Amino acid sequence: MNVVRVKGLHKYYGDLHAVKGVDLEVEEGSIHAILGPNGAGKTTTIKCLLGILKPQKGEVEVLGSSDPEKVLSSISYVPEEKEFYEFLTPVKAVRFCERFVEKFDPSKAIELIKEFRLPENARIGTFSHGMKTQLYLSLALAQNASLFVFDEPTWGLDPIVRNVVLDMIRELSGERTVLYTSHILPEVEKIADKVSIMVRGRFVFHGELEEAKRNFKYIVFDTEVDLPRNLVVATIKKTGAFIAVVYGEDNLQKVKELYPGKARVEEMNLEDIFMSLVRGDSNDDE
Amino acid sequence: MMMNELIKMRIRTLVIFLIMVATLVSLVVLRPFPEFVRKLLGDPAKLLENLKKDDYYLWSQWFGKNLVQFVPLIALLIAFPVFSREVEHGTIYYLLTRSPRSRVYMSKVLTGLFVNASMLIVLSILPAFVAWLLKWNVNYSKFPGYTLHTVCGGTFFLALYMLFSILSSDQVKPIVLGIIVMIGDAFLGMLKPLRFLNVYPYMAGTSVYAGHGVDWVYTFSLLILSVLLLVVGWYRFKNAEF
């Protein structure tokens, strides 16, 4: 069952076409990462899902409802800006959430605040960015939600805390669904079951990480060759090499058949895949 | 949820209240006017004579001078950050992704109306209590009228400033707009055809003091305008993007 379904979503900011007719499906119980460079449209897509932004076109369905407001009590969202009321202390913030959020477990929030070793009675205004992020995550993870939406949850955290947070998110999967945005590849590799790569307002890949690694290949030529655009994802020119990025066994075979004996196939890791999708055709000699 | 909004308002509410109580105390303590004030007034013999009357002194110096000037300011201080600060600080995301917009809007508006009205009711009744303590000869039957005028005027300003707060993504714009309205409203009163737009004489309870009772037409007009402003605010908030 899909917890999130998006079809043909378009979002403009004035003349800027930020999201260009995207489709997205997030399976129940999975950790689904939206991976993309800054400005790709990840946050805009998520905000449209949650009703914070109003899309100009397209269909959105979250937890079976086309009106996100009806299912807010089952969603826990951590935005890109992890800002909470600065005049409160963590303990008072927990009380605030207890009064405001329907399915909120205050004892779990306090437990997480202690686990992050945050000062319980200091004003949030005095916290560093990392501490504010940890507090926000404590409050968000204490919600008994079915869908957790995290927008760059580990940005600004030190590596130790980042790993703790990733473990916490990992533990959510199974019973809960996680939709997660990031531009940090190792993080996504560590926790995501499925990944959607977004570039310039469009999804250029949806699928499992292993599937991506299995299907994306480099084909390396010693000299520049002419390849049909429908067979390659991107091309990279390097000194002494011309590299084509192809997706799928069929396309790989077709390219090899065009230049028999001249093509050398190489594996790609997630970073290679991401970079080639984000950058598209490039000339590394320039 | 209203409790959360009350917590957010508590400091500025307390500060406003203390300033107003200090103002009330000062006008009682300063009676009769010190010599320098009398010199400033020149020779307004009639005014000085009237000021000797407890009833006139209390109405003119409190409702007609101090409180009436503070009513829009109190409304501005309560209303300007209600929405704009949430947007400016990014806390709006926490609210809107955990509660329907209608609930967020209602709790903010109702808390603002409640705090504003409560403060104005207390500040309208407090002078009556002070007068009773000092055994001044005042007409207590006029106080409900003064209170109604003050609260209705304050509600109108609050609704207007709430709309400014909704329309702004930072806290500076609603303050600037609020100050322009406060000053502009008084200036409009100087032009005869637009005199009705000046809310200050109404809020001062002039008709009540003069013995004409509550100005019901103006009262209902202000209440209808306040409701309209809140409805416009709701549609703007409902469709706003953050």
Locate predicted features.
Chain B
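Residue-level signal for transmembrane alpha-helical positions in Major Facilitator Superfamily
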Residues: 75, 122, 156, 228-229
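Terminal transmembrane helical anchor/hairpin motif
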Residues: 8, 27-61, 175-242
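Aromatic- and glycine-rich beta-strand/loop motifs that create alpha-glucan
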Residues: 1-20
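Transmembrane helix-loop junction
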Residues: 4, 85, 128, 132, ...
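Transmembrane helix boundary and interhelical loop/hinge segments in multi-pass membrane proteins
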Residues: 77-96, 109
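Hydrophobic/aromatic residues in alpha-helical transmembrane segments
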Residues: 75-79, 126, 159-160, 199, ...
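Long, hydrophobic alpha-helical segments
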Residues: 59-85
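Secretory targeting signals
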Residues: 20-21, 25-28, 48-69, 105-166, ...
